[in-house]
Amino acid sequence: MKNSFLFFVLLVVLLSCNTTTENKEAKGEELPIQGTWKLLTGTLIEKGDTTVTDYTKEKEFIKIINDTHFAFLSHDLSKGKNADSLFSAGGGNYSLHDSSYTEHLAYCNDRQWEGNDFHFIVRVQNDTLIQQGIEKIDSLSVDRMNVEKYVRVKDHL
């Protein structure tokens, strides 16, 4: 009787572990977006006009994502010594449900962007992250599609 009870408890524990794994598989694993990402290209589509920016020349942009927050930093590669000097930074918390990624921009050097939520669809394929969604801020007359293509920054250790 004692052996039957122990066998039953062991069976329940094993099945519980298996069920948890199956539930994770059924729900789908979270996309592996955590890490540091370097922006390769940014495409803005606004009022029928498309602007593609190459972030591998003359400027650089990175996004850092941990388990609850994101931050971005961008600057020109001429160290601010020409007419195209640039620095921008921002960040906040985010949520991720399947491929639906929402950023809440709490901090930004362009303060009028603060406090806004931006909804994106994200895809990760190997070391590439593609983020696509609408940026809309009525008070600034911003209403555009933004498509960003990132590559994961490898550790240099």
What is each residue range found by the language model?
Residues 17-89, 102-157:
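Lipid interaction determinants
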Residues 4-14:
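Sec-dependent N-terminal signal peptides
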